Amino acid sequence: MARKENRDRDREERDSEFVDKLVHINRVAKVVKGGRRFGFAALVVVGDQKGRVGFGHGKAREVPEAIRKATEAAKRAMIRVPLREGRTLHHDVDGRHGAGRVVLRAAPPGTGIIAGGPMRAVFETLGVQDVVAKSLGSSNPYNMVRATFDALKNEQSPRMVAARRGKKVSEIVGRRSDAAAEAGLE
């Protein structure tokens, strides 16, 4: 009995570190002989505001149950995204899903989250404070969230790039100032 209580307490502590945002609820109807039967689908984004984020989809006959299922699915599907200075992206990225396309751009301090609807929920739960994002094509919340995640999966820190190329981080990051200096001289 004590083991089960410890497991429940550990689960509650782990869950308390996450922030979840409800992005969309969809009501669907099944027509039966006696009338309509309603069901609900929920899209939830969950994150720790420190670089981990996930999204989930849940369906049920009642809204709270659909949200609970979506939250559980989101916690199981979390990804880690490297953040620059813990507040923005390292570089600009594009993402696609279906007809939805998103463009995410790193922003200077004080910019805030400039993003529409479902993308804003992703950035708030991720812990991004400064970003500029544009959604093109589909405005379907599912496609927008999936396209945003596609873009975030392509995000790479200078450390990751340096490891892949077999170089030092200073060689990767140092090029920004070298390139700017060369451009200014010529």
Curated annotation (Swiss-Prot):
The gene is rpsE. Residues 18-81 form the S5 DRBM domain. Keywords: Ribonucleoprotein, Ribosomal protein, RNA-binding, rRNA-binding. SUPFAM superfamilies: dsRNA-binding domain-like, Ribosomal protein S5 domain 2-like. Part of the 30S ribosomal subunit. Contacts proteins S4 and S8. The N-terminal domain interacts with the head of the 30S subunit; the C-terminal domain interacts with the body and contacts protein S4. The interaction surface between S4 and S5 is involved in control of translational fidelity. With S4 and S12 plays an important role in translational accuracy. Located at the back of the 30S subunit body where it stabilizes the conformation of the head with respect to the body. This is Small ribosomal subunit protein uS5. The lineage of its organism: Bacteria, Pseudomonadati, Pseudomonadota, Alphaproteobacteria, Hyphomicrobiales.
